[in-house]
């Protein structure tokens, strides 16, 4: 399977009250997760939340940079780009 991919920039707030996709700040998607930023738990929560929301298997959401930062870059299937663009333009 040779599907094209694109990069989504996200800003993560760990140790929040709930797992939630908040919305956009410019071109960056803001996400809150309940997990602490320890041993990759917050990263795993971000991947799980996006995968569930976009109806993707977790293996299709790949962290490519920002492993220890609040600002992260994720690789997503090209098929999700129109969904994310809709969120950006019309809200979640």
Swiss-Prot record:
Instruction: Report the InterPro entries cross-referenced here.
Output: DUF167, YggU-like_sf
Q: Which SUPFAM superfamilies match?
A: YggU-like
A Pfam family of the record is: DUF167
This entry carries the following GO cellular component terms, namely:
cytoplasm
What family, per the record?
Answer: Belongs to the UPF0235 family.
Q: What is this protein called?
A: UPF0235 protein CCA_00247
């Amino acid at each position: 399977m040779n599907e094209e991919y694109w990069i989504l920039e996200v800003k993560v707030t760990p140790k929040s009250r709930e797992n939630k996709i908040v919305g956009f700040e410019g071109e960056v998607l803001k996400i809150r997760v309940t997990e602490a930023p320890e041993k990759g738990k917050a990263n795993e929560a971000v991947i799980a939340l996006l995968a569930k929301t976009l109806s993707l298997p977790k293996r299709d959401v790949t962290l490519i940079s920002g492993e220890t930062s609040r600002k992260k870059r994720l690789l997503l299937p090209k098929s999700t780009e129109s969904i994310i663009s809709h969120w950006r333009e019309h809200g979640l």
